[in-house]
Amino acid sequence: MNTLTASSAEQLMRSRYSAFCVGDIVYLLMTLHPDYRTDDDKAVLQLTIEQTTWLGLKVIQHKPGVEKGTVEFVAFYTAKPFEQLHELSRFKKEAGQWLYTDGDILPAVKLSRNEYCFCNSEKKYKKCHGK
């Protein structure tokens, strides 16, 4: 196996994103720092890859360093089944300003097949993500 070494944190992040896209679990494990590995990494990665379709990557910021670096990015994806956050949020008004305080996570909402899809495609759910 001829593996190139990333020259920056950004380059490694981009290559790991590509590995997620093509399902290269070996590379993902190989490029995960040993101190941060867990026994179930392989199974979690396999499940993620099976249930996720990656749509695109946008790097927002890269702060390089000699021994440490950071990369801020957004990865766009669809998951099967799709994920949702259903929350009951609490707010408080102080000094005339509404502020979010906290919230409770609630069970997922079941979507009707005849509702418009959550992705704003203007298609009904049954003809879009509900297939």
Question: Regions from the language model: what does each represent?
Answer:
Residues 48-84:
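Surface-exposed, charged secondary-structure patches
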Residues 23, 33, 70-72, 92, ...:
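Long C-terminal interaction/binding lobes of large macromolecular proteins
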Residues 113-122:
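Short Cys/His-rich zinc-binding micro-motifs
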Residues 1-15:
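Short, low-complexity N-terminal intrinsically disordered segments enriched in polar/charged residues
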Residues 22, 30-62:
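Short solvent-exposed beta->alpha transition segments
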Residues 1, 126-130:
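Cysteine-rich micro-motifs
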Residues 16, 20-27:
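Short helix-adjacent coil turns
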Residues 84-112, 127:
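Short beta-strand edge/turn micro-motifs at domain boundaries
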